[in-house]
Amino acid sequence: MWINVINLHKCTIIKLIKDISWRDIMENIKDQNKNVSYKTRTLVSTALFAGIICTTIAYFLHVPMGGSGEYVHVGDAFIYLAAVLLPTPYAACAAAIGSAMADILTGSANWAFATIIIKPILVLFFTSKSKNIINVRNVFAAIIAGILGTILYMIAGGIMYGSFKSAFILTVVGLIQPVGSFIIFIVIGLAFDKLKIKQKIK
């Protein structure tokens, strides 16, 4: 009797195993691995961009200006690059972390709070879905980001100084920042497009 029961269970288990679609299971495992791999690559790329943004803002053509920790730089170009190469939420994180770290490392920690708010806003105008970095939308996005960033920092400066006149004067002097960042973004973007960077990192 027990032998018959065991044989019955054995036949049932074998039938269940045969009925399972192993191909579907393997495809699901592959899909999950792809998702994990994509997420891992995206997180690593985000951290890398945060480091690049921090370095370029803090040390590459970094020009101190004024006596309250202000400075001009062209590191925003790499925020724009992050915005066209990474999904928007990740680009925003890279922009906030990298830029705020640059403020802290260069003795401008008083600007870090404003930076954490302003820099992520700049990435919202770009698209990372196009096969090319330089396209009509991203060119206009770089222009808008430069203008908006300048205005927002002027407002932040006015609040910090208690004088919008002083903030406006420093903003006019610092117009090299959005202009320089725009030019560098276009130059690097065109070079990357020629090398088909976006297709290679997908």
Give each language-model segment a name.
Residues 2-202:
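Loop-helix junctions at membrane interfaces
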